């Protein structure tokens, strides 16, 4: 049974979906320990995330690996690369740098709120302008 795609998910939608699906798993606490490992990477199930986003797993993998990781990858002072998404990190397959993903999502959410405020204020200005025109037309008669 294939996945029906209505539209491709946005970067914000992909990050939000992964965050919501795996937030309770971070940090991973091994049985018998009180503190989780200081490992920022969580293994994700690309197929499950794709299913939740109603897109094909192959497209989601490509989006994560070829676009988002390339877009957000950076080098630290020592030359080590920090990845958002890695094919394999230690024993983990399809590893996502969860703290980094969380920070990127927070920035996307902030930008989204700013855009909503801008659109809302623009709509309010438009309504007030229309009301002023109507008031002028009514009082001019």
Residue ranges and their predicted role:
Residues 1-43:
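N-terminal extramembrane/targeting module of integral membrane proteins
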Residues 46-50:
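A short acidic, leucine-rich amphipathic alpha-helix
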């Amino acid at each position: 049974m294939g996945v029906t795609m209505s539209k491709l998910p946005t970067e914000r939608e992909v990050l939000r979906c992964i965050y919501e699906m795996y937030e309770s798993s971070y940090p991973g606490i091994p049985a018998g320990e009180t503190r989780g490992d200081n490992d920022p990477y969580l293994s994700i199930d690309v197929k499950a995330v794709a299913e939740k986003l109603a897109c094909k797993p192959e497209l989601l993998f490509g989006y994560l690996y070829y676009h988002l990781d390339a877009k957000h990858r950076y080098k630290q002072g020592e030359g080590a690369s920090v990845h958002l998404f890695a094919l394999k990190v230690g024993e983990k397959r399809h590893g996502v740098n969860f703290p980094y993903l969380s920070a990127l999502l927070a920035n996307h959410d902030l930008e989204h709120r700013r855009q909503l405020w801008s659109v809302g204020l623009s709509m309010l200005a438009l309504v007030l302008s229309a009301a002023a025109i109507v008031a002028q037309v009514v009082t001019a008669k």
